[in-house]
């Protein structure tokens, strides 16, 4: 069965936790493990924070878009902004790379996404925005039977 939800919100840092909890609540219908749910929440936090800080440069007028599609035990997550874009995606995906060292950003966002998700695709165009496509296979819970 297919189920989906779409969310959009202002590019404000306080909305990052809203996005994380909302996506986790939606994905919970698949009965993921706590580790899987934590990984999804972490990835949402990283991608939304990237959109707010890097995509929109903390401009609250920007809008962050999230789509979640659940189908056959797979979570398809899309996080999009219409911000400044990424000039060099390959460089941006390198561990420790950051465009904002003055903010003490770790530069680990994409690395975390790649470690926690089964697939990560980043598409971006300078001055048009960035879209991050993420896929996670949820393992079937093994309930104890008496």
Curated annotation (Swiss-Prot):
> Mind listing the GO biological process terms from this record?
asexual sporulation; negative regulation of sporulation resulting in formation of a cellular spore; sporulation resulting in formation of a cellular spore
Source domain of life: Bacteria
- Which catalytic reaction applies to this protein? L-seryl-[protein] + ATP = O-phospho-L-seryl-[protein] + ADP + H(+); L-threonyl-[protein] + ATP = O-phospho-L-threonyl-[protein] + ADP + H(+)
Does the keyword Cell cycle feature in the UniProt annotation?
Answer: no
Q: What EC number is given for this enzyme?
A: 2.7.11.1
Record keyword Transferase present: yes
Keywords of the record, alphabetical order, are:
ATP-binding, Kinase, Nucleotide-binding, Serine/threonine-protein kinase, Sporulation, Transferase
Q: What class of enzyme is it?
A: transferase
The UniProt similarity line reads: Belongs to the anti-sigma-factor family.
What is the name listed in the Swiss-Prot or TrEMBL entry for this protein?
Answer: Anti-sigma F factor
In which organism is this protein found?
Geobacillus sp. (strain WCH70)
**What gene makes this protein?**
spoIIAB
